[in-house]
Amino acid sequence: MYIFAFLPIFALLILENMKKTIYLLAALLLLLSSCKSKKNLVSPIARPVLNTDSIRPDSSDVVARLFAPDTSGLKKLSARRKAAEKRQVASSGITRSIPPVVARGTNITSSAVSVSSVYPGIDRVKRYEFTHRDVPEAFDGFRIAFISDLHYKSLFKEKGLESLVRLLNAQHADVLLMGGDYQEGCQFVPELFAALAKVKTPLGTYGVMGNNDYERCHDEIIREMKRYGMRPLEHQLDTLRRNGEQIILAGVRNPFDLANNGVSPTLSLSPADFVILLVHTPDYAEDVSVANSDLVLAGHTHGGQVRIFGYAPIIPSHYGSRFLTGLKYNSAKIPMIVTNGIGTSNKNIRIGAPAEIVMITLHRLRNE
């Protein structure tokens, strides 16, 4: 009747793992065959005890493997997790590199600095160091300020606008790029652009329109931008020149109307040029070919606007969370920086998606 002492172990291992159950049966057969008399048997007691004295020497390895924890799954999980971490740019305050296998000739790092205590209405400055082999020598160290989704007079109001202007001027950017969705009413457009005109950059200010701006106030925004010397880019190109060298800016007109705007303005450019594509939604860079772009700047998602433990229940993208925020890549491995933006839409609330400005510093890749 001693065999009943092992019934709890049978039950446990059958539930746990069929492979281990087979090992257990093999071990028990070895135990039984090694018993030469009754004194070698394990007596039935309240708590079963394995009599290790009765194990043959050649069966010890089987038993050791049987009772050793199976860590193969953990090792595979750890390997997958490390691989995933290498392909991500860090969240706030941490800097990591994107390996060359993702984007040959490109290296990108990021960090974030909280500024809300000094600049009410703006939570942080998200910084990117963008190193690329096609960056001209004259643009090594070139600083780009990028803002989007102001939705002026939503959660973002007069005090936030004043903070934004001060913060942008404190960055000493060489150019200001804007990603659209500027307003929550046409009556606010003149006030908004009069304030943004106070941002001083050597190479000026450029912008595209967002879906809000095509629904209303499009003509008013274009008029106010031109009044202050800003350049709207609606399926247009412009050239930034510095010390005899240049980079190209391309802007997309209404990226939601692919029937009319489904051919990217970058397709006419040379792969040898360094090209920044400015578009309101990151979906456009996946919906159509944006070949010859070296960097895409987009907004629209608001970083989810409300994120609970990283989960955003509402994301205005037909790709879900794929292009939610931060450094992303389209299927062609073209890097995209997607900003959380500043204002809000629908509900005047932000949780887990800090209002931000983006600062990008270009660097020329010296050695691959």
Name the predicted role of every residue range:
Residues 123, 132-145, 230-231, 238-250, ...:
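Beta-strand-turn-beta hairpins that frame and shape the catalytic cleft
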Residues 35-143, 154:
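Acidic, histidine-bearing metal-coordination/catalytic regions of metal-dependent phosphoesterases
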Residues 147-148, 175-181, 204-211, 233-236, ...:
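Active-site neighborhood of phospho(di)ester-bond hydrolases with catalytic His/Asp-centered motifs
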Residues 5, 19-25:
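Sec-dependent signal peptide recognition
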Residues 138-223, 228-231:
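Membrane-embedded segments
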